[in-house]
Amino acid sequence: MAVFTFEDQTTSPVAPATLYKALVKDADTIVPKAVDSFKSVEIVEGNGGPGTIKKISFVEDGETKFVLHKIEEIDEANLGYSYSIVGGAALPDTAEKISIDSKLSDGPNGGSVVKLSIKYHSKGDAPPNEDELKAGKAKSDALFKVIEAYLLANP
């Protein structure tokens, strides 16, 4: 298995503590409200802390799909959160898992800076498919913007 690491950063007008609360602490209720295509978030294993696996169900192209999301680490004091995609529609056949480490910090005008480190754990040594990476990033960015808009409209 090879591991390929990608770094990303974005800004948001939403304050770090508010964004963290919505994306980590209250995500199971906020995300289905904010994102029409998301139908449910259910815990399939664990108690909500590290090691917990969540099944996130959503509709894409008229078909119900799911993602298995495993919580790796919660660092509320430093606004950090780590999780892995371990199964379902968002995990390409070429990957064993995709791990995401996120960290929020103060940004311009009371907003946030979001730093991401994405680790693609491939099956074998083959690098990830560039088109799959671009499509995944586009979906992730769009999802983030929808949640951000929801938070701005519902302070």
Curated annotation (Swiss-Prot):
- Methyltransferase listed as a keyword: no
Cellular component, GO annotation: cytoplasm; nucleus
What switches on expression, per the entry, is described as: By fungal elicitor.
Q: Its domain of life?
A: Eukaryota
Keywords (A to Z) from UniProt: Pathogenesis-related protein, Plant defense
Q: Which BP terms in the Gene Ontology apply to this protein? A: abscisic acid-activated signaling pathway; defense response
Q: Which InterPro entries match?
A: Bet_v_I/MLP, Bet_v_I_allergen, Plant_def-hormone_signal, START-like_dom_sf
- Which Gene Ontology terms cover its molecular function? abscisic acid binding; protein phosphatase inhibitor activity; signaling receptor activity
Q: Which family does it belong to?
A: Belongs to the BetVI family.
Which PANTHER family does the UniProt record give? OS08G0374000 PROTEIN-RELATED (PTHR31213), STRESS-INDUCED PROTEIN SAM22 (PTHR31213:SF55)
Protein name, UniProt field:
Pathogenesis-related protein 2
